[in-house]
Amino acid sequence: TVGGKLADEQQVLCQIAIAVLESVNATATDQCSVGGTDATRQALLGGDIDLYWEYTGTAWVTFLGRKPIQDSKAQYEAVKQQDLIHNNIVWLAPTPFNNTYAFAIKAERAQQLGLRTLSDMAAYIRSGQPGNLCIEPEYQNRDDGFPGLQRAYGFEVPAGRLKVLQAGPIYQAIADQKECLFGEVYTTDGRIPELGLTVLADDKLYHPLYNAAPILRKQIYDRNPNIAKAFAPISAALTNEVMAELNRQRSAEGRSPRRVARDWLGQHGFIANGS
């Protein structure tokens, strides 16, 4: 039984997992909409589902209560080892994509202003030039969110220039360039390519790393160790650009997660075309 959280990305990843399992003749039951992070994790630990995709940073910080590690390989190896020791959970190969917090700007504005990194953004804000910065409520108060970002990059946004919006509307507001010059986004969101935005590089590596990997209970893995080999090339192919494009097909074009997943797998020869 394959589970997933409710976000578009999780729905697409869940359908990828089902198709991969079927391609190695395993029977996969679709439980792709379990709920939020905690509910999905509990479903795995309790045996209601056997496999789902989790993010390294989420498991390390939220489930294991540790401080983020700012190297994606080291973060993955640490969470893989500790989750197995403490919870009997096996982590399969991780994705290169990292769905973390970031700041974006309209691509042509970034070029005009010569902005490539968050250090560039901080310098621009310190110089007092016009333009608001938009963030979502949760990010505003999280210690690993905005307060820490301003400390890490040494800038402070004047009260009148900081706008707090819900996560969804921020993308369009950056594209419109009226309310927001800069906005907080998630790196693999499909609206980034759809709306012509560009993500500023986190050159001081402030934000936690959220690489994804399929995870499953050890007893299931021990019965089907060949699953690891089936997933490895697929995880490896899921870069930020690929994941954002699959998310875009889901969010902007309204395609079903199943079709998005199977078309991509088929095009790249991971499964038979048209299956």
Residue ranges and their predicted role:
Residues 1-15, 33-36, 138-141:
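Extracytoplasmic "Venus flytrap"
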Residues 50, 128-202:
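Ligand-binding pocket segment of bilobal, Venus flytrap-like solute-binding proteins
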Residues 63-92, 177-181, 191-204:
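Ligand-binding "clamshell"
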Residues 8-27, 147, 151:
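Short, polar/charged alpha-helical segment
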Residues 9, 140-144, 148-152, 225-275:
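An extracytoplasmic/periplasmic, membrane-proximal ligand-sensing/linker region
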Residues 36-37, 47-60, 75-76, 167, ...:
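Beta->alpha turn/N-cap motifs
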Residues 73-132, 236-240:
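A conserved helix-loop-strand patch within extracytoplasmic ligand-binding domains
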